[in-house]
């Protein structure tokens, strides 16, 4: 029958800032610059103090982006670093996703993150005239370079595709192939997320939702195109049709990502209660088990202080 294990990361999200210089038309996360203050270390410490380290392992640091040429950029990076260091001090394992970074920025954050991430989304440049026409950092070549840079720096990395934002099915194969090629060079990709576009109340333009009935086929293609040691992840809160969810697992999806109190990217789609989700999977013959934000095969890649932190935390 084979391995019938599905993993997830018990997680909590810290948002340094919702302000972002990109204006992706489908975004339900960003706010205009100057409309909301940044998360202070004091406020973050209060949020972390309310968590149970026995139940939460990962602190996802998910941030809006400050423009590369902004005078606020260095302050922003310092805040990302300090929040990750704070999470480590409180007994959690940080994973940062904050948009494209320079080599120096990525190197700095490597010291305080057990893994990092950036969605490639889609490799086709045509989206730069569509949903990404006001989003400079969504240049696909810039994002592909980030994957390469993470590999060169030996950073365990998560990436993925955003489905249903104006691309064609052949674009999925091109994007998956590019991820596979980068992983064959560096071996650093932990998982690839297949995220269906799911409309929310805050986005600037109404896009139709991705047709979930296509998702099992995308999972199947991903499994055939990606190396076997890359895990395929689907967000359980966005795959709202049970039979589609089940078909995705049978097609090769093996991880549900971070299960958090609030999905800040898709705030209109709450996660199913964990006990209910476990029961549902069990009825289908699957066992849901927690994991850390760094996969076991990558622990030895980490700087010694981080490696020790990981060893202190039970799965």
Swiss-Prot record:
InterPro entries: Aldolase_TIM (IPR013785), CofG_family (IPR019939), Elp3/MiaA/NifB-like_rSAM (IPR006638), F420 (IPR034405), rSAM (IPR007197). SUPFAM superfamilies: Radical SAM enzymes (SSF102114). It catalyses: 5-amino-5-(4-hydroxybenzyl)-6-(D-ribitylimino)-5,6-dihydrouracil + S-adenosyl-L-methionine = 7,8-didemethyl-8-hydroxy-5-deazariboflavin + 5'-deoxyadenosine + L-methionine + NH4(+) + H(+). One of its GO terms (molecular function) is transferase activity, transferring alkyl or aryl (other than methyl) groups. Pathway: Cofactor biosynthesis; coenzyme F0 biosynthesis. Its EC number is 4.3.1.32. Residues 6-237 form the Radical SAM core domain. Pfam families: Radical_SAM (PF04055). [4Fe-4S] cluster binds at residues 20, 24, 27. The keyword Metal-binding applies. Binds 1 [4Fe-4S] cluster. The cluster is coordinated with 3 cysteines and an exchangeable S-adenosyl-L-methionine. Belongs to the radical SAM superfamily. CofG family. Catalyzes the radical-mediated synthesis of 7,8-didemethyl-8-hydroxy-5-deazariboflavin from 5-amino-5-(4-hydroxybenzyl)-6-(D-ribitylimino)-5,6-dihydrouracil. This is 7,8-didemethyl-8-hydroxy-5-deazariboflavin synthase. The gene is cofG.
């Amino acid at each position: 029958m084979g391995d019938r294990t599905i993993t997830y990361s018990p997680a909590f999200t810290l948002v340094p800032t919702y302000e972002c210089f990109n204006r992706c038309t489908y975004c339900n996360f960003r706010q205009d610059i100057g409309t909301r203050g940044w998360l202070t270390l004091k406020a973050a410490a209060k949020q972390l103090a309310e968590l149970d380290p026995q139940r939460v392992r990962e602190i996802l640091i998910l941030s809006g982006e400050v423009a590369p040429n902004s005078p606020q950029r260095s302050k922003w990076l310092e805040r990302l670093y300090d929040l990750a260091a704070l999470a480590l001090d409180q007994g959690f394992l940080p994973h940062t996703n904050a948009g494209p970074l320079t080599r120096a920025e990525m190197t700095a954050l490597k010291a305080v993150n057990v893994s990092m991430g950036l969605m490639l989304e889609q490799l086709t440049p045509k989206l730069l005239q569509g949903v990404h026409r006001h989003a400079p950092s969504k240049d696909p070549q810039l994002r592909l370079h980030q994957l390469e840079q993470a590999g060169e720096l030996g950073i365990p990395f998560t990436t993925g595709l955003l489905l249903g934002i104006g691309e064609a099915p052949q674009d999925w194969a091109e994007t998956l192939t590019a991820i596979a090629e980068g992983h064959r060079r560096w071996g650093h990709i932990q998982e690839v997320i297949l995220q269906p576009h799911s409309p929310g109340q805050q986005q600037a333009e109404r896009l139709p939702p991705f047709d979930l009935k296509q998702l099992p086929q995308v999972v199947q293609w991903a499994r055939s195109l990606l190396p076997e040691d890359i895990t395929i992840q689907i967000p359980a809160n966005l795959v709202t049709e049970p039979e589609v969810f089940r078909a995705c697992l049978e097609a090769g999806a093996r991880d549900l990502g971070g299960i958090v109190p609030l999905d800040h990217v898709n705030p209109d789609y709450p996660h199913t209660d964990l006990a209910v989700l476990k029961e549902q999977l069990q009825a289908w013959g699957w066992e849901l088990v927690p994991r850390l934000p760094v996969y076991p095969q990558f622990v030895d890649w980490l700087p010694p202080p981080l490696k020790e932190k990981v060893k202190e935390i039970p799965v």
